């Protein structure tokens, strides 16, 4: 799958908005400040995004883009289920433990009591999109006749939950804590091995 050409103005706005949200939080950032940070005119900003909510949703979607592209490529281009899931898990771990992704997660949790729409916006723009793609993949495996996955919804949720686990909580609570490349690789390997034995039932 080839990604669409990036609009330089849109990307500048997303980069500026990401910097502002992470530095100042959601409530303390105005559309005027984002326009200045980009820097673009207010007219250009509103031509791309009509509200601060829409802009935050785009920031979250942008962070998730690489994972969603990997999922699409892996599940369409190859019949090797274990390899496909390894690619998806590797991309997911890179996203889950990325500094910006952790910071956005903290921001949404901190701001949600006063801006309850942020939690739903975050979920729809990030985790839900990934879950839906993986659920669809598991349903296709069932339909193909080679696998019998009893509950594709639970199976998809369990997959991403195992990649987060206690480590994700500790990284959220300790800003300096990050898994090394070897630790992430080991996490992926262990999750895939457990998953292939315990969650996906290949028909003999």
Map each language-model feature to its residues:
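All-alpha amphipathic helical-bundle segments outside canonical DNA-binding/catalytic cores
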Residues: 121-126, 142-160, 185
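Amphipathic alpha-helical linker/stalk segments
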Residues: 57-88, 96, 100, 104, ...
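C-terminal peripheral helix-coil segments that are non-catalytic and often amphipathic
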Residues: 91, 132, 136-143, 158, ...
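Amphipathic alpha-helical segments that line or abut small-molecule/effector binding pockets
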Residues: 15, 82-98, 102-113, 153, ...
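Short secondary-structure transition hinges
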Residues: 94-136, 177-181
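Short amphipathic alpha-helical segment with a characteristic S/N-K-E followed by hydrophobic residues
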Residues: 13, 51-56, 66, 118, ...
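Basic, helix-initiating cap at the start of DNA-binding domains
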Residues: 1-40, 47-54, 79-80
């Amino acid at each position: 799958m080839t990604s669409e050409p990036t609009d330089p103005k849109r990307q500048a706005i997303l980069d500026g908005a990401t910097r502002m949200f992470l530095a100042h939080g959601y409530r303390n950032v105005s559309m005027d400040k984002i326009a200045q940070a980009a820097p673009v005119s207010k007219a250009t900003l509103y031509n791309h995004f009509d509200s601060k909510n829409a802009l935050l949703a785009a920031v979250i979607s942008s962070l998730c883009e690489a994972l969603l592209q990997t999922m699409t490529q892996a599940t369409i281009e190859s019949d090797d289920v274990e390899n496909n899931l390894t690619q998806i898990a590797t991309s997911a771990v890179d996203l889950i433990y990325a500094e910006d992704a952790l910071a956005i997660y903290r921001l949404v949790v901190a701001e949600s009591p006063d801006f309850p729409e942020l939690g739903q916006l975050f979920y729809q723009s990030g985790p839900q999109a990934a879950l839906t793609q993986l659920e669809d993949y598991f349903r296709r495996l069932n339909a193909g006749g080679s696998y019998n996955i009893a509950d594709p919804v639970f199976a998809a949720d369990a997959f991403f939950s195992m990649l987060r686990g206690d480590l994700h909580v500790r990284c959220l609570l300790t800003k300096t804590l990050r898994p090394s490349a070897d630790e992430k690789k080991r996490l992926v390997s262990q999750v895939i091995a457990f998953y292939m034995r315990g969650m996906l039932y290949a028909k003999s």
